[in-house]
From Swiss-Prot:
Residues 1-48, 201-225 are annotated as: Disordered. Residues 216-225 have a biased composition (Basic residues). Residues 64-136 form the HTH merR-type domain. GO terms for molecular function: DNA binding; DNA-binding transcription factor activity. The keyword Transcription applies. SMART domains: HTH_MERR. Residues 20-29 have a biased composition (Basic and acidic residues). PANTHER family: HTH MERR-TYPE DOMAIN-CONTAINING PROTEIN, REDOX-CYCLING DRUG-SENSING TRANSCRIPTIONAL ACTIVATOR SOXR. GO terms for biological process: negative regulation of DNA-templated transcription. This is Uncharacterized HTH-type transcriptional regulator Rv1830. It comes from Mycobacterium tuberculosis (strain ATCC 25618 / H37Rv). Keywords: DNA-binding, Transcription, Transcription regulation.
Length: 225
C-alpha cells in the first residue's frame, strides 16, 4: 500500500511518488476493524465491474461544469468549493475564474476529486493530509483512478492496491474507513448526466435532460402562442 501523508515505506507497499501496482479493485465504501478483514479481502480480490462508464469510454475532459453544478454533483457547499479553489486544493482544470463575469469549469475528474475530499473530511482527516493525498491522485488519469481504494484510520490516508495490503491495514487493530474510487466514479457518472455541461473548445454544449414539469410548461406555452 502507499501511505499518502509521509514517504515512509510500508511492509508491502511503495513510497509516495513510485507507481503502485494497478491491481483491479472494486470495494464498496465501508468501515472495518481488525477481525473483520475478510470482507475487505474478498472485495479486493474481485475485478472492477464492467460498465464503469455508459459507453465504456473515458469521460470527455473537454466538457466542464460550472461551480454551482459541481457543488450539487459532489455534495459540497459553494463556500467549500470556492475555498478549495482559492487555496489550490482542488482547482478547476478546464477554466479558472479570471475577472468579473468569468465562470469556473470543472472536469469529471475535478468533481471526482471534490467528492473524495468531501468523504475524507467527513472521516475527520485534516486538510493538510487531504492535500497530500489529492496531490498524489492528481497525477493519475481517470482510468487509473478506477483501480484505487483509499483507506484512512482517521489520521493517515493509505492507497491500497491488493487484498493483502487491505488485510495488513485491518490487522492494525483500529477502525478504518474505505473509499472505493471506482464506486464514487460510477455514482458520479449517473448523477452528472442530469447536469448541463459546457465544452471548453467551443463545441456544442451538453444539455441536461429536460424534466417533466419543464416539458409540460414548454408544451403549454406553444399552445398559448
Amino acid at each position: 500500500m502507499t501511505q499518502l501523508v509521509t514517504r515512509a515505506r510500508s511492509a508491502r507497499g511503495s513510497t509516495l511518488g513510485e507507481q503502485p501496482r494497478q491491481d483491479q479493485l472494486d470495494f464498496a465504501d465501508h468501515t472495518g476493524t481488525a477481525g473483520d478483514g475478510n470482507d475487505g479481502a474478498a472485495a479486493a480480490s474481485g475485478p472492477v465491474q464492467p460498465g464503469l462508464f455508459p459507453d465504456d469510454s473515458v469521460p470527455d475532459e473537454l466538457v466542464g461544469y460550472r461551480g454551482p453544478s459541481a457543488c450539487q454533483i459532489a455534495g459540497i457547499t459553494y463556500r467549500q468549493l470556492d475555498y478549495w479553489a482559492r487555496t489550490s486544493l482542488v482547482v478547476p482544470s478546464i477554466r479558472s475564474a479570471a475577472g468579473s463575469g468569468s465562470q469556473r469549469l470543472y472536469s469529471f475528474k475535478d468533481i471526482l476529486v471534490l467528492k473524495i475530499v468531501k468523504r475524507l473530511l467527513d472521516t475527520g482527516i485534516s486538510l493538510h493530509n487531504i492535500r497530500v493525498a489529492v496531490d498524489h491522485l492528481r497525477q493519475r488519469g481517470v482510468q487509473d483512478l478506477a483501480n484505487i481504494t483509499l483507506f484512512s484510520d482517521g489520521t493517515t490516508v493509505y492507497e491500497c492496491t491488493s487484498a493483502e495490503e487491505v488485510v495488513d491495514l485491518l490487522q492494525g487493530g483500529q477502525g478504518v474507513f474505505g473509499i472505493a474510487v471506482s464506486g464514487a466514479m460510477r455514482e458520479l457518472t449517473g448523477v452528472i448526466a442530469d447536469f448541463h455541461g459546457e465544452r471548453a473548445d467551443g463545441g456544442e454544449s451538453i444539455a441536461a435532460p429536460e424534466d417533466e414539469l419543464a416539458s409540460r410548461r414548454k408544451h403549454r406555452d406553444r399552445k398559448i402562442g
